[in-house]
Amino acid sequence: MSSDPQAVSGKSAALAGRTLVVTRPQEQADSLCRRIEVAGGHTIRFPVLAIAPAPDTAQLEAIVPRLDEFDLAFFVSPNAIHHALDFVLARRSWPAGLRVATVGKGSERVLLQRGFLEPIVPQDGFDSESVLALPEFAAAAIRGRKVLIFRGDGGRDLIRDTLRERGAQVEYVTCYRRYCPQLDPAILLQPAARGELDALLLTSSEGVRNLALILGGEGLRALHDVPVFASHARIAVQARDAGFAKVIETPAGDDGLLQALTKYFG
C-alpha cells in the first residue's frame, strides 16, 4: 500500500496543470488517465503497444479439451486472461481442479472479476522473479506438475525455463499478439516543441522500443529532456539506453506511478 494517501486517491495538487503522456495499450489506459485527470493533470494517450487476438487459434483450439490434464494455469497479463478465458469459456467450463496464477494487481483484479476467488499472485513483486519465489512454484511443490502458460507472442521465457528445471512439465498457449501501432509522431512532437510535455510514462520494455520506432531518431532526440517514469528496472535501463536524460524508476501499477509523480512534481 502506498505511504502517500494523496497519491493513491488522486487528490494531490502536485499534478495540476501537468501534461503526462500515457503509453499503455488503449484498452488498459483508462484507469490511469482518469486518476491523473482527477488530480488535475492532462493526459495525452499515445499507445505505443497494440493488442489483438492471436491470428492463429490452433493452440487455443487444441488446449480446450486438454485443460483437465493440467494442475496450474498461469496468465502473464490481463490481456492473456481476457483472450484465453473468452475463447475457452465460450466452449467449455473451467475445470474445477485447475488452479490459476498470475502476476500484478491488475491481473489479479481481472481474475477476481472473472470469478476465480483464490488466484495465486505474488504480493511483493510484479515480475517473473517474484512469481518464481512463491512457495507454489518452489521445486518441491511444482516437480511433476503440469503447468499451462497463457501468453502473447514473444516475451520472456524465464518462468517456463525455471519451472522445467524444477521438474515441471510446461506448455505455452499464445492467445494474443502485440504489435507496434501506426501513430502520428506530431501528437508528441508538437507539444514537446512548445515545452508542454511534463512526463512520459513507460510501462513496458517493448513500449520503449516501439516509441523509438514510431518517433524515429530525430523525433526521439526531441524528447530526451522530458522526464520518463519507468515502472520497472528493466524499463528504466532501456529508457536510459534510448537516450532519455531523466529516468525515474517507480513501483509497478497505478499506485506506484501516481506516488512517484506526486513526489516528483510536489
Regions found by a protein language model. Name each.
Residues 1-266:
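Conserved beta-alpha
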